[in-house]
Amino acid sequence: MKVKTRFAPSPTGNLHIGSIRTALYSWLFARHHNGKFVLRIEDTDLVRSELISIDSIFNGLKWLGLNWDEGPYFQTKRLDRYKEVINVMLEKEDAYICVCSCQELEEIRKKQIEKGNKPRYPGTCRNLNIKNISNQNHVIRFKNPLFGKVKFQDKIRGEIVFDNAELDDLVIQRSNGMPTYNFCVVVDDMDMKITHVIRGEDHISNTPRQINILNSLKVKIPVYAHLSMILDEKGNKISKRKNAINIIEYYENGFLPEALLNYIIRLGWSYGDKEIFNLSEMKELFNLKSITKSSSTVNFKKLLWMNKYYINNSPLDYVSDCLKNYMEKKNINVEKGPDLELLVKLFRSRHHTLKEITESCRYFYEEINFFNHTVIEKYFTRKNCFILQTCYKKIEKLSIWDNKNISKIINDVSELIKVTKKEISMILRISMTGDICSPSISTVILLIGKEKALLRINNVVNYIKNL
């Protein structure tokens, strides 16, 4: 059997960590078995479907490298096919026309609730064999079996059983002519020859209905694996329309795709005590048996730790390329500063994300036009002005531009004017970076370059003089 999985999001909200976990597990399972991974957009909810959400799905999957082998298929482009299958089911009397009004159904529902019964369609039109409906509003319902049980072996949860008596006759076509979610899914899985359906546990209740429709169509039932929910840090279920972070925001916040995938795979799956998995290891080791039934909770600190690990342990040229792309997206001209590999070496052990690195090294690429009020009050003094003027003269005369000679200037100025190297380094740091924290100041000055370093010292000297 050729394995074929699918990721079938509805474009009605953000593509979030829960969605990506479903996509990742489906993708890995297909890759592990040398199968195919299908992308399908379930967009029949015309009211809530959004183009921006479709873009989010495509961009998120591409950024993470979860390439698809078939698709993207759009359900709204398959409406004729759904109608064709519905007509076959009507002819076989596996489906029927229902003319019950919304008002009638609501009255029935209220009475059932008053009696303490589960609300369900009573089958009013089931055996009426309605054919001539002219322009009368109607829906089409699937004729669900009245007796027996629906059993399926969930790859994560074991055997799950539903009683057909608990399932009512599902609407498969709405009064506006649009097919419903549960019906479209069945036809799509049938036509696309999906062998394994990996999805969230909120779909467990849909599964018996879908199996019954598949049985009526005489189609082989796929293997099901229902993933437990992912909770946010407050213990709430992540919902794409409420508390979910769009997956692209992780890119905006400077996360590496490998780090995010490694973090997400561990939200419900494990391989002993191993924490770090590269993509090849994920494809080799992933299996459905090791997925837990318990809910997983997002831990942002763990994600930051994971991202820092990848920034520090991925090849230098790769991290530099990622940083270059990130900085260019932030409209920073990387040609105006030092080689990015030098900056990655200098900064990656200090930070968790590309965003943090970018914010920490902007001064290499952009001029400093603002100084914090506290910095001005504490450090912009006549004494420090004199220190800077002395450093300026020494740096201006420096012929060999290297770290050793820049460090020597700081030592020489310290001895010459009897101030500590710490004081000299601090005012130089503020002049170069606009901040009181940075890597080694001699290294910073080296990377900024002689011309720009002299200009910045001169700017601060003039600033102090004009106070």
From Swiss-Prot:
GO terms for molecular function: ATP binding; glutamate-tRNA ligase activity; tRNA binding; zinc ion binding. Its EC number is 6.1.1.17. One of its GO terms (cellular component) is cytosol. Keywords: Aminoacyl-tRNA synthetase, ATP-binding, Cytoplasm, Ligase, Nucleotide-binding, Protein biosynthesis. Disulfide bonds: none annotated. ATP binds at K240. Its main location: cytoplasm. GO terms for biological process: glutamyl-tRNA aminoacylation. It catalyses: tRNA(Glu) + L-glutamate + ATP = L-glutamyl-tRNA(Glu) + AMP + diphosphate. A motif ('KMSKS' region) lies at residues 237-241. It is an enzyme of class 6 (ligase). InterPro entries: aa-tRNA-synth_I_cd-bd, aa-tRNA-synth_I_codon-bd_sub2, aa_tRNA-synth_I_cd-bd_sf, Glu-tRNA-ligase_bac/mito, Glu/Gln-tRNA-synth, Glu/Gln-tRNA-synth_Ib_cat-dom, GluQ/Sye, GluRS_core. It is found in: Cytoplasm. A motif ('HIGH' region) lies at residues 9-19. HAMAP family: Glu_tRNA_synth_type1. PANTHER family: GLUTAMATE--TRNA LIGASE, GLUTAMATE--TRNA LIGASE, MITOCHONDRIAL-RELATED. Catalyzes the attachment of glutamate to tRNA(Glu) in a two-step reaction: glutamate is first activated by ATP to form Glu-AMP and then transferred to the acceptor end of tRNA(Glu). NCBIfam families: gltX_bact. Belongs to the class-I aminoacyl-tRNA synthetase family. Glutamate--tRNA ligase type 1 subfamily. Monomer. This is Glutamate--tRNA ligase. The gene is gltX.
